Amino acid sequence: DNLIPLALAAIVLFVLYMAYRKARQARRERLIDSYRFPESIAAKVGKTYPHLNDAEVMRVMQGLREYFHLCNMAGRRMVSMPSQAVDVAWHEFILFTRKYEHFCGKALGRFLHHTPAEAMRSPTSAQVGIKTAWRLSCLREGMQPRAAHRLPLLFAIDAQLNIADGFRYALDCKRSPGDDYCAGHIGCSSGC
């Protein structure tokens, strides 16, 4: 007799918790979309890559927003940074320590540390992180990660903007130059 009210209470609590999580996720997404980054971040990107015009610098800033969306979706899982240009913007944002800490707390619910690949716990951490970035990027752009028909923004931007020290990815690994990372392997290797 007492189990029915307890079961109903548990169901109600679960539904309320799920509604809270959904509302929190939507609030964080709106914050990431509307956040005004310090103007000097875009200036730093432009100084680092002087061949970029204003629209291309803004594309890098959009990439930074996109990266934060991926981190928000990933929760506490590590997401590797697929773009060198966007990484420059992220580094510059980190220098605004109070603003960065406040943004992370509100947009991600935690402080997002920047960990170089060399300092990761294990050699496979970066691989897991790039697979997470690939999967979430594809999902955000409406593609199945194992059957992407194009590169998502964060995987395409360095090549599109001709970033000399950038990361380059290719969907078709057989047709790509030898310097490209094979995105096909990221999307469909075992362990994805």
Model-assigned labels for residue ranges:
Residues 1-192:
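Acidic, Ser/Thr/Pro-rich intrinsically disordered cytosolic tails and loops
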